[in-house]
Every structure is written in structure tokens, then in C-alpha cells.
Amino acid sequence: MSEEKDTPLEAFASLKHSGVTPQKVRRIVDLIRGRSVDEALAILRFSPHSASGILYKLIVSAQANYANLLGRDDDLFVSSVYVDEGKTYKRGRPRARGSSSRILKRGSHVTVTLSKEVR
């Protein structure tokens, strides 16, 4: 009998406590979900949004994690990407008559999963 190794079919990379708001990151995430890694990296490279650089580095990191686990680099797809809300910092802005209004500085957590097949 020959034993088959359980090869991991997925590789993960996550970013916690990002300073970009979840709304801005989700706008870019919807463009790359379900695409091949090469196609997703090309989209992110030429996208003018601030979240593009963060997602670009995150996908490259997940690709390196996959290559490190298996020792080879296959044609991978972005099978799932999700953005969760991180910590919200509350700041005040001076207003008229000595009052102030609240400003919310939102953060996000991003997780990328690469696999050989799209779910």
C-alpha cells in the first residue's frame, strides 16, 4: 500500500490592524475575487486606490506561503478574500460654540486565500 501525503490545497495570508477603512478595501477586493493570481496582481498594480498596495503585498505573501509549503509554484487563484472591521479610533473635531463632533478612524483586517481551484 502506498500512502498519499495530504498536500495543502490552500495558502493563507492575513493583515491585521490596517489603517485603511473596510469600505475602501472592499471596493478593490471585489475586483480580484475569483481571478488568477497573475491577473489579480496586474489589476492591483495599475489601480490608483490606496488599498491596492496593501492587497498586492498580501497576495505576494500568500503566494510565497504556498510555494514554501509545497516547494513548487502552481497556477493559483484568489479563492476567497474577506475584509473585517478592525479597531475604530475616535477623534474629536472642534465645532461652533465650543462643541465638538466625533470623527471615526476605522481600521480593517484582511485575509486572502489562494488555491488551485476557485470555490
UniProtKB/Swiss-Prot annotation:
Q: Which GO terms describe its biological process?
A: translation
Q: Does the keyword rRNA-binding apply?
A: yes
Claim: rRNA-binding is one of the keywords in the record: yes
InterPro entries under this entry?
Ribosomal_uL22, Ribosomal_uL22_bac/chlpt-type, Ribosomal_uL22_bac/org-type, Ribosomal_uL22_CS, Ribosomal_uL22_sf
- What keywords would UniProt list here? Ribonucleoprotein, Ribosomal protein, RNA-binding, rRNA-binding
Q: Which residue ranges traverse the bilayer?
A: none
One Pfam family from the UniProt entry?
A: Ribosomal_L22
Example GO molecular function term?
Answer: rRNA binding
* Cellular component GO terms, alphabetical: cytosolic large ribosomal subunit
Q: Which PANTHER family match?
A: CHLOROPLAST 50S RIBOSOMAL PROTEIN L22-RELATED (PTHR13501), LARGE RIBOSOMAL SUBUNIT PROTEIN UL22M (PTHR13501:SF8)
Query: Which family, according to UniProt?
Result: Belongs to the universal ribosomal protein uL22 family.
Protein function: This protein binds specifically to 23S rRNA; its binding is stimulated by other ribosomal proteins, e.g. L4, L17, and L20. It is important during the early stages of 50S assembly. It makes multiple contacts with different domains of the 23S rRNA in the assembled 50S subunit and ribosome. The globular domain of the protein is located near the polypeptide exit tunnel on the outside of the subunit, while an extended beta-hairpin is found that lines the wall of the exit tunnel in the center of the 70S ribosome.
Q: How does it assemble?
A: Part of the 50S ribosomal subunit.
* Protein name listed in UniProt: Large ribosomal subunit protein uL22
